[in-house]
From Swiss-Prot:
The gene is fusA. Residues 19-260 form the tr-type G domain. It comes from Methanococcoides methylutens. SMART domains: EFG_C, EFG_IV. The keyword GTP-binding applies. GO terms for cellular component: cytosol; ribonucleoprotein complex. Belongs to the TRAFAC class translation factor GTPase superfamily. Classic translation factor GTPase family. EF-G/EF-2 subfamily. It is found in: Cytoplasm. This is Elongation factor 2. Catalyzes the GTP-dependent ribosomal translocation step during translation elongation. During this step, the ribosome changes from the pre-translocational (PRE) to the post-translocational (POST) state as the newly formed A-site-bound peptidyl-tRNA and P-site-bound deacylated tRNA move to the P and E sites, respectively. Catalyzes the coordinated movement of the two tRNA molecules, the mRNA and conformational changes in the ribosome. Disulfide bonds: none annotated.
């Protein structure tokens, strides 16, 4: 314990000097070696035994992670590294690589300033590598590259020294091509990765060695010698001469920014307040004496302390007993404990200053994405946008009736811990529905509810979440209130694709300054008048108030928009969420007495006008698609392609490398249930595969009636497809 205590003392001493801090994440495709790399960095810092590093998987502290051999949650740790006779504090987050847990990566990107991108030298860049790199660049997080498993290239693929350099060069070029394509401005500012400069390291996380150009200069070990050591399988000597933690941490400290350098650039990307005054200025310089600005990026449950909110502290300092405001909460919260993480352990400290990643208890109203501040009325941070959407749903029931109240509380907790999970109560059937990123995601959550929360549950087989949208235009359609005194006239049409995409990416929101929003909408192809009159955005749908001078509309607008949101959450065709719908209010007639235009009158009138108009505008269903990447020996290629084509899938591209074929394809999520077992059988267990969410595509016309009827029946609605008249009968 003495060693750990000493480490805590060193960590706390360095916390208050942001120049000496690096907040970083390790990101990669699944099984490319992130957690093994993290272990060796910790061993180098003296936090775990060197003999166990790479096998202990210290960061995978969850029982399920160890069983499945994958990282499911992001794990945080603070450690100290000495570079050029100075001590630095590295706050490290190890993230999951499986596509179903990509939400953890997105949230981690908000907390860090730099990322070590890990790529398997044999497999090269894979779909999830591209996804995590895109998320990093979107949040203005600077990447450096670690090419792992170089020993496999030499010993398994038997490449010679020259071919190895060519292959590694190609891999680096490909990463740079991705960086340039995703953020050219940053690429031109020197964010490209370059072996000669030192922003690329090569090595083996399993055998604990790594080399980079600065490391070669420091140790005198040449690339040729590395090759010879690997051929002789003398990894031990290589690990002693070129320890992995030294090469990687030196690269992190030399090239990734400190909070002072990073925040000046990043604050404008993640916060839309005034950067020239008050808290904006304080965040830009990570001012520990300024007002508190803390963003929650993760929530976990501690059996003793309750909810632990982890996040990035941009300005001010956190200490016990502070009273703080949480965005969206009515009353202030009081901070109970502040601490830092050492893998699975949370260690209490007295105070944490700006520029650090902190773990706090007492924020009962916080959710992931909350802004926590001492400044009442501070404009909140931009919400965290996830690359994927929940597309698979299961119904959850408690096995024993006595557990029902506990299940309701447990579901509230898991939704708070994992914001990519959507929990809803189906009013018709009384079932709790749990929507997640994929089969594995929901399996893990269900297992945790039973294991950690102690509630036995049963779940239905997974079903797909569709999207309702319109392909035509309709209106003006009249919606009447039950008392006949209020009428709304709406037009619906498809929302411009570019506008929809910008909303989905978080580039356009109702939170941003009006002028900036208007300019972006016009640039995306919206009519000037419409851009000026946008009244609400919900998911990827928008509402426009095109009326002029209607009395009492201002005070009624909130209720009108409530009707809009209700329909966008559950469309008229099958009560599935809507996407890409533009609703325009063209005219309204309102009763002059407020008593006659209350919620019970206005909401149904607003809602029914939109529902009827959507059914007139060719309301249809879109289904979620995933890209499927398969690596298989050539002789198994036929089995793999047949497996995709038999699931309404399309082969997009096929490339060969040696005797391996890489198939890029896409298929509907509804057809991919059970794919893992089937592809294993079809290729005799020799295929490696991964998926990536690519969005929604139209459901084939010949399937619409059957699918809609099935959804309606499942939800306890009339099986027959609804007609516009059903909503206009009032």
């Amino acid at each position: 314990m003495g060693r750990r205590k000493k480490m805590v003392e060193r960590v706390t001493a360095l916390m208050s000097n942001p120049v000496m801090i690096r907040n970083i994440a390790i990101i990669a495709h699944i099984d490319h070696g992130k957690t093994t790399l993290s272990d060796n960095l910790l061993a180098g810092a003296g936090m775990i035994s060197k003999d166990l590093a790479g096998r202990q998987l210290f960061m995978d502290s969850d029982e399920e992670e160890q069983e499945r051999g994958i990282t499911i949650d992001s794990a945080n740790v603070s450690m100290v590294h000495e570079f050029e006779d100075e001590e630095y504090l590295i706050n490290l987050i190890d993230t999951p690589g499986h596509v179903d847990f990509g939400g953890d990566v997105t949230r981690a990107m908000r907390a860090v300033d730099g990322a070590v991108v890990v790529i398997d030298a044999v497999e090269g860049t894979m779909p999830q590598t591209e996804t995590v790199l895109r998320q990093a660049l979107k949040e203005h997080v600077r990447p450096v590259l670690f090419i792992n498993k170089v020993d496999r290239l030499i010993n398994e693929l038997q490449v010679d020294a020259q071919e190895m350099q060519i292959r590694l060069g190609k891999l680096i070029d490909h990463v740079n091509k991705l960086i340039k394509g995703m953020n050219e401005e940053r690429y031109n500012q020197g964010w490209r990765v370059d072996a000669a400069e030192g922003t690329v390291a090569f090595g083996s996380a399993l055998y604990n060695w790594a080399i980079s150009v600065p490391m070669m200069q420091k140790t005198g070990v040449s690339f040729g010698e590395v090759f010879d050591y690997c051929r002789a399988e003398d990894m031990k000597s290589l690990g002693e001469k070129c320890p992995l933690h030294e090469a990687v941490n030196d690269m992190v400290i030399r090239f990734l920014p400190s909070p002072i350098d990073a925040q000046e650039d990043r604050v404008g990307v993640i916060w839309h307040g005034d950067l020239e005054a008050g808290i904006g200025k304080q965040m830009a310089v990570a001012d520990a004496t300024g007002d508190l600005a803390f963003m929650v990026t993760d929530i976990s449950m501690d059996p003793h302390a309750g909810e632990v909110s982890t996040g990035r502290l941009f300005s001010g300092s956190l200490s016990r007993g502070m009273e703080v405001y949480v965005s969206g909460a009515a009353k202030p919260n009081r901070i109970q404990q502040v601490g830092v993480f050492m893998g699975p352990e949370r260690l209490e400290v007295d105070k944490i200053p700006a520029g650090n990643i902190a773990a706090v208890t007492g924020l009962r109203d916080a959710i992931v994405g909350s802004t926590v501040t001492t400044l009442d009325g501070m404009s909140p941070f931009e919400s965290i946008r996830h690359a994927s959407e929940p597309v698979v749903t299961v119904a959850v029931e408690a096995k024993h009736m006595k557990d029902l109240p506990k299940l309701v509380e447990v579901l509230r907790q898991v939704a708070k811990e994992d914001p990519t999970l959507k929990i809803t109560l189906d009013e018709e059937t009384g079932e709790h529905l749990m929507a997640g990123m994929g089969e594995l995601h929901l399996e893990v959550i269900a297992h945790r509810i039973e294991r950690d929360k102690g509630v036995e549950i049963s779940t239905t087989p997974p079903i797909v979440v569709y999207r309702e949208t319109i392909t035509g235009t309709a209106g003006p359609v009249e919606g009447k209130s039950p008392n006949r005194h209020n009428r709304f006239y709406v037009v619906v049409e498809p929302l411009e694709p570019e506008v929809r995409e910008l909303i989905r990416e978080g580039e356009i929101s109702m939170r941003m300054p009006e002028l900036e929003r208007r300019e972006k909408l016009i640039a995306a192809g919206l009519d000037k008048d419409e851009a000026k009159r946008i009244a609400d955005i919900f998911e990827s749908n928008a509402y426009f108030d095109m009326t002029k001078g209607i009395q009492h509309l201002n005070e009624t607008m909130e209720l009108v928009l409530e009707g809009f949101v209700e329909v966008m959450k559950a469309g008229p065709l099958s009560k599935e969420p809507c996407m890409g719908v533009k609703v325009k209010l063209m005219d309204a007639k309102l009763h002059e007495d407020a008593v006659h235009r209350g919620p019970a009158q206005v909401i149904p009138a607003s809602r029914q006008a939109i529902q009827a108009a959507m059914l007139m505008a060719d309301d249809t269903l879109f289904e979620p698609y995933q890209k499927v990447f398969i690596q298989t020996p050539q002789e198994q290629m036929g089995g793999a392609t047949k497996e995709i084509q038999g699931r309404r899938g399309i082969i997009i591209d096929m490339t060969s490398e040696g005797d391996t074929t890489i198939i890029e394809s896409k298929a509907p999520v509804s057809e991919l249930f059970g794919f893992a077992g089937d592809i294993r059988s079809a290729t005799e267990g020799r295929a490696m595969w991964s998926t990536e969410f690519v969005g929604f595509e139209p459901l084939p016309t010949n399937m619409i009636t059957e699918v809609v009827s099935g959804i309606r029946e499942r939800k306890g609605l009339k099986k027959d497809l609804p007609q516009a008249q059903d909503f206009m009968s009032m």
